[in-house]
Amino acid sequence: LNEPYKLNYEISGEDKKKKKQDLLNKMWRNQCINDTYEPGSTFKVVTATAALENNVVTLDSRFSCPGFRIVDDRKIRCHKTTGHGAETFLQGTMNSCNPVFIDVGLKVGVKKFYKELDKLGLLQKTGIDIPGEAGTIIHQIKNVGNVELATMSFGQSFQITPVQYL
């Protein structure tokens, strides 16, 4: 049933060799270092760290969530489409509220946000002694506008490896 060396169907010759090699490569692929992903809401702790360390917010800073935030010409939604209403930064963090983190990310600003990413080692490979480590896929700082920063603040529009995020 689950034998990676056996094919489910009959092929022959070069196709068989290629398919077998593809299966072996897939079986031995280390997704923790070879693949990147958007960290999503788990990344909000990084944005929170940047905001708190730069004194941009306190735990009691007040925000409002109507279920979305308009950034430039884009409507970016919260997972709670009816909104969380009035909330503090601490409550917004507990609610994993995208509009709160959009506001916070924009207050932190691009330069400080990238400085925090660099400080945490998220802009370069870890240097782990395992072959095939992928690197961060992220906008160049000069190309980051409000929309990009807004979505990055809650872990979208860039990619890192799981090992980088440890």
Regions found by a protein language model. Name each.
Residues 1-41, 46-166:
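Beta-lactam-recognizing serine transpeptidase/beta-lactamase-like catalytic domain environment
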